[in-house]
Amino acid sequence: MQIVTDKNKVALYYKDEATTYKEFILNTRKIKQFTKIKQFTNNMIYMENRPELLYSFFAIWDSRATCVCIDASSTAEEMTYYIDNSDVIKIFTSNMQVEKVKEALNILNKQIEIIVVDEINLNEIKIDENSSENLVINSPEKEDTALILYTSGTTGKPKGVMLTFDNILANVDSLDVYKMYEETDITIALLPLHHILPLLGIGVMPLLYSATIVFLEDISSAALIDAMKKYKVTMLIGVPKLWEVMHKKIMDTINSKGITRFIFKLAKKINSLAFSKVIFKKVSEGFGGHIKFFVSGGSKLNPQITKDFHTLGIKICEGYGMTETSPIISYTPKNDIVPDSAGRVIKDVEVKIADDSEILVKGRNVMKGYYKNPEATAEIIDKDGWLHTGDLGKLENGYLYVTGRKKEMIVLSNGKNINPIEIETKISSMTNLISEIVITEYNSILTAVIHPDLEKVKDEKIDNIYENLKWEVVDKYNQKAPDYKKILDVKIINEDFPKTKIGKIRRFMIADMLDGKIEKQERKPEPDFEEYNKIKKYLIDIKGKDVYFDSHIEIDLGMDSLDMVEFQYFLDLNYGIKEENLISKYPTLLELANYIKDNRNQERIGNLDWKEILNKDTNADLP
């Protein structure tokens, strides 16, 4: 594989050290020589993002063998499945992961060669550095299985997706027209390289275009921003969650002042990228000042985020695909961005929309099949060669729009079909108080399960988030929705939804979550001081539920307006605390108890007097 003509150009940065393309290729050849990888064998890579991951990856390819890339966060128990299913003969790993590999092999009672890259001293491996043979990385043959990647899946056991070298080349060739990379580009290996999107987009393509990759020691927002500034990063590939976090931080800053709100509205109206780049120069400088565009993939991006970043002078190009299509099916041209679309179908890929709106795909990029699973392969690729994505969508003016998941459609007892994503998007657009929402059928009725943005709730001093969302958001949605799409129940939760490792919500687990059947993380020891114990006992008595130090008083305990009136009176009576919006400021039991301990007046002992409560002006909006 001819990667680059200028061997002295920097290929990688890691721990403040630069690795040239010549050094990169030589290190790859040394790994190959040292590990003696056999042709046509399966070899596993199980390590965190680091240069040795790419050396090992290309050494496997150079040997015309198959690379099995596994998520470095996988547990030993999960590893037993991957090792057993993939028939690997070598496992490339790191000091950080090796104990989990040993534990998995012990469980399986298998002997497989473990190669710990930290223990390989590349400087001690002798190789002819001037030999032309050692300055080239060979690629597998087109029909060879180059990769086996396991789908995380929202249900069932992971399946090993077999991708040929030609599958991968098809995507590289098709994306060439978009000029994703140029020789002067610098990107960051932010996403884990066991996924096909970052593996291709961050691990392979930059090297084919003579660009530069930066590896981070610390995956944190501070480390990311520092690296973007230090290395003058020009392009970044991320998932929607990354852009959501960045968007929230930027927009919170803009909305905090009237003048910046006005400037943003003005820039939005003018709708000129050139104007926005000047007026919001500080935003660009916050990302290092050299960003050309961002790329988003993995799941659908909220179109408002795309629009707002455009108003800020930054392009986000969205792509759509799946592991089984190597991965890209459609991609957004950086000079023709259409928010809410997944871009244009890429060259040499055919897409058609089935009668039931499912997106079907055919092309060189479609996988060879699932490893040792012909039945599952036959379920997803029909006799005519069309791969059934399971996604719903439409084609308009050459752009592909993904509208939902086929298996996530809700079929009501009256036969009506409901696309939950459509309702979720609509309700989310009506308020800034929702962090995440899932529309599901629970106890045979259409239910909105909402995880609020608790920081926003606190900032806006909302004491009863349930009633705010129910009456100010969901009820207003219901007033305009057809009867069969009306939300009949609202559940507020104080925890993240169960998700796959790439952040997709496991919708089939929502009912179990609501029923309390999902095991929660072990809690820290309970605090033990007077105010905490007394408030906790009171809450247990009135709600009849388990109460913990991190329990959200309103959401976890289901406190309604009358409960809140009584509780506020309890705090007044016992601690002399009459402060407004107390629960929104200190929403958990421990936060509230600590505040009471530090701010209580002389305690007044007495029992609750309902006559006094009912005569008291509560200012509560009762439904």
Segments predicted by a language model, with ranges:
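Conserved AMP-binding A3 loop
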Residues: T20-K22, A146-V172
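Conserved C-terminal "lid"/linker of ANL adenylate-forming enzymes
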Residues: V438, S444, V474-D528
